[in-house]
């Protein structure tokens, strides 16, 4: 299965009538493996900040999490495993695997829990597969 198929079929899939607004699979070096059409362009410093927060949990909390120039308030995640952010009625979930970052962006009516489930389920599967 191609990386694009993982984005299209596993991240952008419909869940309880809803789906993510944007999603991507990105290497730890910031290279985009696959993304939805609506996913914003990631800046190198944004990826560096995300990786740093996984290595040193809490570093993004004071400044916020930036993805494609959009600022998200960092909310409770799983230190070193999952970063979650909130912006208005939407938000973001980022799951770190051994080689990649699985990123899902959502807006209402999708719920944070639905986003977390979609992103973390694929992340857990890729970890099991060695990615």
Curated annotation (Swiss-Prot):
A GO cellular component entry from the record: cytoskeleton
Subcellular location(s) of the protein: Cytoplasm, Cytoskeleton
Keyword hit for Lyase: no
Q: Which GO terms describe its molecular function?
A: actin monomer binding; proline-rich region binding
Asked whether the keyword Disulfide bond is assigned, the reply is yes
State the tissue distribution: Expressed predominantly in endosperm but is also found at low levels in all tissues examined, including mature and germinated pollen.
InterPro entries in the record? PFN, PFN_euk, PFN_sf, Profilin_CS
Q: Output the GO biological process annotations, alphabetical, semicolon-separated.
A: nuclear migration; pollen development; pollen tube growth; regulation of actin cytoskeleton organization
Superkingdom, natural source: Eukaryota
Task: Give me the disulphide-bonded residues.
Answer: 13-115
Q: Where is this motif: Involved in PIP2 interaction?
A: 81-97
- Record key words, sorted: Actin-binding, Allergen, Cytoplasm, Cytoskeleton, Disulfide bond, Phosphoprotein
User: Post-translational modification, briefly?
Assistant: Phosphorylated by MAP kinases.
What are the Phosphothreonine sites (modified residues) in this protein?
A: 111
Q: Chief location of this protein?
A: cytoplasm
The record describes its quaternary structure and partners as:
Occurs in many kinds of cells as a complex with monomeric actin in a 1:1 ratio.
UniProt record similarity statement = Belongs to the profilin family.
Q: What does this protein do?
A: Binds to actin and affects the structure of the cytoskeleton. At high concentrations, profilin prevents the polymerization of actin, whereas it enhances it at low concentrations. By binding to PIP2, it inhibits the formation of IP3 and DG. Has a high affinity for poly-proline.
Q: What is this protein called?
A: Profilin-4
What does the record give as the organism's lineage?
A: Eukaryota, Viridiplantae, Streptophyta, Embryophyta, Tracheophyta
């Amino acid at each position: 299965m191609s990386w694009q198929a993982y984005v299209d079929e596993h991240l952008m899939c419909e869940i309880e009538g809803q789906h993510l607004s944007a999603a991507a699979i990105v290497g730890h070096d910031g290279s985009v493996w696959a993304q939805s059409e609506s996913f914003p362009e990631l800046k190198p410093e944004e990826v560096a900040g995300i990786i740093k927060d996984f290595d040193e949990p809490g570093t993004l909390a004071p400044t916020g999490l930036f993805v494609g120039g959009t600022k998200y308030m960092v909310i409770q995640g799983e230190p070193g495993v999952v970063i979650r952010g909130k912006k208005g009625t939407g938000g973001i979930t980022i799951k770190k695997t051994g080689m990649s970052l699985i990123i899902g962006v959502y807006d209402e009516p999708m719920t944070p829990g639905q986003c977390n489930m979609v992103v973390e389920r694929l992340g857990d599967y890729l970890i099991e597969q060695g990615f």
